[in-house]
Amino acid sequence: MISSLKTINIEIILAIDLKKGRVVKAFAGFRLNYKPLKIGNFDLSDPIILIQKTLEKFKLNKVYIADLDAINNLETNNLLIFRILKKFPEIDFLIDSGFDYPISINNFKQTLKKKKISNFIIVLGTEKIKKYNLKVFGYKNRIFLSLDILNDKDKSTGFLKKSKFKPDIILMFLRNVGGRGIRFNEVKRIIKDLPKFKFHYAGGVRYPRDLRLLKNVGVESVIVSTLVHKYLGS
């Protein structure tokens, strides 16, 4: 099973959803339904243990962390996130902590600078940012933009066409989170609509063949949890 993943020339990024200090299992974008992660009889809700177990199976260059509490304007998991970043300095972490204004990014970066932590990339989610003028978030920041798609109105890409700043794009299909399949037609349409951007995909990946299909339509990496959990349980 692991060998089939290794034959696919696409980067796999482990997705971790944090809630109250634990890794939770995503289901269809409804965050009230999230529960602490268990695989078989094993409790893998400790993010450090989860990453360690995943590294035993295959190499990770990047890990995506969504702080669900911060995204919902609750107490953040920042202290835990800082500990994770220090524990795995060889991994780049994509951090989605509900950043809404440039000052929220600057405060986060300054704290990490004081701790001498640099292995992170900021993720801006369109469900949270207050302005779609990406220039105000600064060219100097390492930024991925998460195009958070929950319904049809979230599929607009007009603001990206106008932007001179071209961050990497994460196509985040929230209703497909938890291994509920991929909307390939939507993915192809958006990628065709924005030819000058690099794309990453999240939401609904279930099988190795999904990775091949995403690679074929122009996706550079895939952010996954369900598929990785299957491998950890095998």
Question: What is each model feature region?
Answer:
Residues 58-60, 90, 117-119, 165-167, ...:
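A structural motif
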Residues 30-52:
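Short catalytic helix/loop segments, enriched in acidic residues and glycine
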Residues 11-18, 63-65, 93-97, 120-124, ...:
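Hydrophobic faces of well-ordered beta-strands that scaffold small-molecule active sites
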Residues 93-116, 158-161, 187-195, 199-221:
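Catalytic cores of alpha/beta
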Residues 51-66, 163-169:
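Catalytic domains of carbohydrate-active enzymes, especially glycoside hydrolases
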Residues 15-38, 102-178:
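Conserved anion-binding
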Residues 71-86, 97-111, 124-142, 176-192, ...:
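Active-site-adjacent beta->alpha loops and helix N-cap segments on the catalytic face
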Residues 1-11, 110-114, 231-234:
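Short, Lys/Arg-enriched, disordered terminal segments
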